Amino acid sequence: MATINQLVRKPRSMKVAKSNVPALEACPQKRGVCTRVYTTTPKKPNSALRKVCRVRLTNGFEVTSYIGGEGHNLQEHSVILIRGGRVKDLPGVRYHTVRGALDCSGVKDRKQSRSKYGVKKQKA
C-alpha cells in the first residue's frame, strides 16, 4: 500500500483501454474496397464455408471482414462499408460487412431481422 506522500509525488496511473477494432479509429463504420473475396473454414467444433473478404480501408488499413446472410454480390473492387463485431469461430475476423450499403446488396427474400441485412419492408 502506497503512503499518502508517495501518492502525492506520483499519482496512480489509469489503465489504458485497448480497442477491439483498431482499424475503425473510433468511427462507427469505415468504407473500403474489396481486394479478395473468398470462403474459409471455422475453428473446431464448427464446420462450414464462411464468406469473408479482405478490405483495403480509406485509412490504409487492410482487414478481413465477414459477409453475413445467405448469398452476396461482392467481388474484387466492390466498395463496401464495414462495422465492428468479431466472428467468434473465425480467428482474425474482427469486422462485419454492412449489408444494403454502397455496393453490397441486401439479402434476397429476407422477411425477418431485415434491418440487420439491409432489406426494405415489402409492400403488402
Curated annotation (Swiss-Prot):
This protein's name: Small ribosomal subunit protein uS12
Similarity-based family: Belongs to the universal ribosomal protein uS12 family.
Subunit structure: Part of the 30S ribosomal subunit. Contacts proteins S8 and S17. May interact with IF1 in the 30S initiation complex.
Gene Ontology MF terms in the entry: rRNA binding; structural constituent of ribosome; tRNA binding
Keywords attached to this entry: Methylation, Ribonucleoprotein, Ribosomal protein, RNA-binding, rRNA-binding, tRNA-binding
Pfam families, alphabetized: Ribosom_S12_S23 (PF00164)
One GO CC term on file: small ribosomal subunit
Statement: the UniProt record of this protein carries the keyword Ribosomal protein: yes
Task of the protein: With S4 and S5 plays an important role in translational accuracy. Interacts with and stabilizes bases of the 16S rRNA that are involved in tRNA selection in the A site and with the mRNA backbone. Located at the interface of the 30S and 50S subunits, it traverses the body of the 30S subunit contacting proteins on the other side and probably holding the rRNA structure together. The combined cluster of proteins S8, S12 and S17 appears to hold together the shoulder and platform of the 30S subunit.
Ribonucleoprotein as UniProt keyword: yes
GO biological process, one term: translation
3-methylthioaspartic acid: modified positions: D89
Protein origin, superkingdom: Bacteria
